[in-house]
């Protein structure tokens, strides 16, 4: 089992390291989620494997009318719901249908990018590791942290970070596309009004 004070691997490497289809699929995931390396995929796969293993065990125990199995299933679904991986009314089949991308979608790095706090998913990682992002008022520097649903709305720039200033170049770059689209809409509106007056 090993000494608990030492770090242990939280993932296992692929059994066949040179499978082209798997490598291509992993490369797409690395680009999509801005991952540092494939270990981050394997770590998510290990977590998913653990969840599925528990679900399969519970399914077998439910068939034998195990008294505690239903309670454990409810606790599992409640825990997964806390991370917005499943709904409150989810079933065992929903647990078994979870994918690696469902796990990666709950990473802090992914959510920072989707909340439009970074220009790219890679930049989201940089902002987190450099201490520019806070969750529930606390600075977080771990891009791979799984975010609970209750904390998602509290993700913001760290108050003492220079990026928190709206005049920071990153903030201006984030505002630029929105401003351009707003100006285009205004221009289209003015053009249509002019057309109506000409008639």
Swiss-Prot record:
PANTHER family: 30S 40S RIBOSOMAL PROTEIN (PTHR11831), 40S RIBOSOMAL PROTEIN S9 (PTHR11831:SF5)
Subunit annotation: Part of the 30S ribosomal subunit. Contacts protein S5. The interaction surface between S4 and S5 is involved in control of translational fidelity.
The gene coding this protein: rps4
Stretch list, region Disordered: 177-199
Protein name: Small ribosomal subunit protein uS4
GO annotation terms (biological process): ribosomal small subunit biogenesis; translation
InterPro entries listed in its UniProt record: Ribosomal_uS4, Ribosomal_uS4_arc, Ribosomal_uS4_CS, Ribosomal_uS4_euk/arc, Ribosomal_uS4_N, S4_RNA-bd, S4_RNA-bd_sf
Gene3D superfamilies: RNA-binding S4 domain (3.10.290.10)
Taxonomy, superkingdom: Archaea
Function: One of the primary rRNA binding proteins, it binds directly to 16S rRNA where it nucleates assembly of the body of the 30S subunit.
Keyword entries, A-Z: Ribonucleoprotein, Ribosomal protein, RNA-binding, rRNA-binding
Keyword Kinase part of the UniProt annotation: no
